[in-house]
Amino acid sequence: MPDLRIISPRTPAELEAVRQLCWEYRAYLMSLSAFDAELVTLFYPEAKYAALMEQIAESHAPPHGFIRLAMLGESSVGCGMVHSLSPGSAEIKRVYVTDTTRGIGAGYALMQSLIAECRRLHFERILMDTSKPLVAAQRLYLSLGFRLRGPYQPVPPEAEGHLLYFEMTL
């Protein structure tokens, strides 16, 4: 099996691979349940998500954010990104690995890279959330030292009780 590498996407092709993975992530979330599909459509309607994807490199640009891309050989198999919520606080977003690479450590490697870069950038804590059906992701975050916490941003009533929130002190 080719080596798994975590890179910082820099070329247009690498950034396009991140965008494609984010679209796959959106589709994956929508496939979890009818309720999840409603939430994704509510919070990330297609036009809004397309605009977000067009600005992804800028909205996660250093020194206030960054993107990581998981590569298996020459194939893009996962991504994750960070942006600053406030001085000292980073938020991890859109951690996703493809179906074919789940279980080989790609998610773990992505998270390790994201956490290490947050430390290097002197963030004091990392915040993140995930949907309750994503049990494997929850196990991963807890195994890495994140702890459960309450919401760190206002939660729309439609999403109350459907998300779990995590925090790691660095």
Predicted regions and their residues:
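Short coil/turn segments at alpha/beta junctions that flank glycine-rich nucleotide-binding fingerprints
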Residues: G88, I104, R120-E124
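Residues forming the Rossmann-fold NAD(P)(H) cofactor-binding site
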Residues: I104, Y108, Q112
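C-terminal "cap" of GNAT-fold acetyltransferases
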Residues: P2-R5, R10, E124-L127, S131-L170
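Loop/helix-junction capping segments adjacent to catalytic residues or to phosphate/diphosphate-binding pockets
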Residues: P12-L15, I104, V135
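Acetyl-CoA-dependent GNAT
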Residues: P9-K93, T98-D99, M111-S113, E117, ...
